[in-house]
């Protein structure tokens, strides 16, 4: 990202995350707050070899960028101690980053892991109006 200073914050964050979700974890090395993501993604890629992140939308307000992704994949490897199930999953990710002078200086992400574990059958789904609750 040598030309990061010429990019708007949304482009910086989208570029970094697109590279990371595409398997290029080296792009995370120089971005504080993204180190944990670099440690977790190889495990996700192993569990979901066909993992895909589909950009949905973003919002920019000053230094802050919010990005919404839809993530999909087929569970073909171990995930947090759970053996492969061959089930397809679809879940959401919302990330908020703060970009200062072309650098990501803060990064927070909320991943829909509960939806993943419901789809894999680990956590039962209970409808909000289910009288059995």
Residue ranges and their predicted role:
Residues 1-133:
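C-terminal and inter-domain tail/linker signature
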């Amino acid at each position: 990202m040598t030309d990061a200073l010429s990019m708007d914050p949304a482009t910086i964050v989208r570029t970094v995350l697109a590279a990371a979700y595409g398997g290029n974890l080296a792009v995370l090395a120089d971005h504080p707050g993204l180190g944990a993501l670099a440690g977790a993604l190889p495990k996700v890629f192993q569990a979901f070899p066909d993992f895909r992140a589909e950009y949905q939308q973003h919002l920019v307000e000053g230094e802050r960028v919010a990005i919404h992704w839809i993530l999909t994949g087929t569970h073909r490897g171990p995930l947090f101690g759970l053996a492969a199930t061959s089930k397809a999953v679809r879940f959401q990710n919302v990330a908020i980053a703060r970009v200062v002078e072309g650098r990501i200086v803060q990064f927070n992400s909320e991943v829909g892991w509960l939806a993943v574990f419901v789809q894999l059958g680990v956590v039962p789904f209970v409808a909000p109006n289910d009288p059995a609750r």
